[in-house]
Amino acid sequence: MTRLKDKYLNEAAPALIEKFKYSSRMQVPKLEKVVLNMGVGEVKDNPKAMDSAVNDMTLITGQKPIVTKAKKSVAAFKLRQGMNIGCKVTLRGDRMYEFVDKLFNVAIPRVRDFRGLSSNSFDGRGNYSMGIKDQLIFPEIEYDKVDKLRGMDIVFVTTAKSDEEAKELLKLLGMPFSQN
């Protein structure tokens, strides 16, 4: 069992039961999945950029990403339907807990001038979204082998019914929210 899953079962879940007065253990919110998405806009000029992005995301998550394609053509962006425009990974189970543990304890503290994550990024249904400006904060990425800095979106999908429950869950798992 991963360290973060153990922390959830032994510390976070009992604390949530106590705070929100759940009558059943099954009502306790849990982390369902984590979705990482990386848009690769420069792929229309440089076809090799997609390989680099896929490789980076594979190193970061330990799982091969799926390549996303354009749903429709947009002339202003010189985009045709079916062109590769990014990649995404959905993490569940132990891989998800290992990634979240690494993100909270290793990657996020490496961000320069980091003062905590905004607590305004909840969607109203208990899911949290955040963005990362470059992939160098992850220890698996070697600085010398990076051709271009690429950011990514990370979405934490929980079974929580409200943002308050989801925020408490993520806080108990170790997400560093800002104090304001």
Curated annotation (Swiss-Prot):
Q: Which SUPFAM superfamilies match?
A: RL5-like
**Keyword set includes tRNA-binding:** yes
Alphabetized GO MF terms: rRNA binding; structural constituent of ribosome; tRNA binding
Q: Which GO terms describe its biological process?
A: translation
Report one GO cellular component: ribosome
Which keywords fit this entry according to its UniProt record? Ribonucleoprotein, Ribosomal protein, RNA-binding, rRNA-binding, tRNA-binding
Q: Domain of life here?
A: Bacteria
Q: Which InterPro entries does this entry report, sorted A to Z?
A: Ribosomal_uL5, Ribosomal_uL5_bac-type, Ribosomal_uL5_C, Ribosomal_uL5_CS, Ribosomal_uL5_dom_sf, Ribosomal_uL5_N
UniProt keyword Ribosomal protein present: yes
Q: Which HAMAP family match?
A: Ribosomal_uL5_B
PANTHER family registered for this protein in UniProt: 60S RIBOSOMAL PROTEIN L11-RELATED
Q: What family does the Swiss-Prot or TrEMBL record give for this protein?
A: Belongs to the universal ribosomal protein uL5 family.
Q: NCBIfam families annotated for this entry?
A: PRK00010.1
How does the annotation summarize its subunit structure? Part of the 50S ribosomal subunit; part of the 5S rRNA/L5/L18/L25 subcomplex. Contacts the 5S rRNA and the P site tRNA. Forms a bridge to the 30S subunit in the 70S ribosome.
**Could you tell me what this protein is called?**
Large ribosomal subunit protein uL5
UniProt source species: Ruminiclostridium cellulolyticum (strain ATCC 35319 / DSM 5812 / JCM 6584 / H10) (Clostridium cellulolyticum)
Q: Which gene encodes it?
A: rplE
